[in-house]
A protein has these predicted regions:
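Catalytic-site microenvironment of enzymes
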Residues: 2-5, 9-11, 15-242
């Protein structure tokens, strides 16, 4: 199962032309794993932008569980892999990126089946099993960083792989906090980007992913403008093939 195109398409929106000067600087992030830890900053297009990337679930909570060829697919493993890939691309473009959920061992993985673990932490702290405590912990982490960061463009991105859609074709769904005009703008731009890229690369597929308000704890309680994405469903056979 792989969501490579998601990373690319998100970047069409997130790579804002703040200062699109080419650069060649070395970078290093151990969370990406030994093979991917080293990277080069090749552009300053996102210089001054800060992103708080949060993968769903983790630690004692695997999230939604799918079955594929005799293996269990845990939502948290795939959401985390997507977050790492997205974060690496953002950092290559000069952005400052905070990974709120972390696994010191996994790194970016290319296997079709990602092994499951409970090692994930919230920036080094054990993740509680209690749902409210778990969500509060990650919101507190985002907000503490948000208060310290000086940049003007600061956005939080939450990624889950448990879409409520049960159709054979599961699209990406975009949510923002109730009453958040900036959140609505962010999610609508994401939606339009996906629609455009599907028309370009898969013109016969169609795209029905919607934008809506959703009264989620993490959207209500994070200080930066936030988008919550359901990028598929780990239990959906078609998504498992992706």
């Amino acid at each position: 199962m792989r969501f490579g195109l998601l990373t690319i398409w998100l970047l069409f929106l997130l790579a804002l032309p703040l200062n699109a000067k080419k650069e060649r600087k070395p970078g290093y992030e151990p969370l990406f794993g030994k093979a991917q830890a080293a990277y080069k900053v090749t552009s300053s297009s996102l210089k001054g932008a800060t992103f708080y990337l949060v993968s769903g679930h983790g630690g004692p909570d695997p999230g939604c569980i799918g079955k594929y060829q005799g293996h269990e697919l845990h939502e948290d493993e795939y959401a985390y892999d997507i977050i790492l890939r997205l974060g690496r691309e953002l950092m290559k473009r000069g952005a400052k990126v905070h990974f709120i959920i972390q696994d010191a061992k996994d790194g970016i993985r290319n296997q079709a089946i990602l092994k499951n673990s409970k090692r994930e932490t919230c920036m080094g702290k054990a993740i509680p099993l209690n749902q409210v405590a778990r969500l509060k912990q990650r919101c507190d982490a985002v907000n503490a960083l948000y208060r310290k960061d000086k940049g003007r463009y600061k956005r939080a991105i939450f990624i889950h792989v448990d879409s409520r859609s049960r159709r054979n074709q599961t699209d990406v769904f975009f949510y923002h906090a109730p009453g958040s005009s900036k959140g609505r703008v962010l999610t609508r731009e994401l939606q339009r980007t996906f629609q455009s890229k599907y028309r370009q690369h898969q013109p016969n597929r169609g795209f029905d992913g919607s934008v809506s308000e959703r009264n989620l704890y993490v959207l209500r309680n994070t200080a930066p403008v936030a988008a919550f994405l359901e990028v598929g469903n780990i239990q959906n056979a078609q998504d498992q093939k992706r």
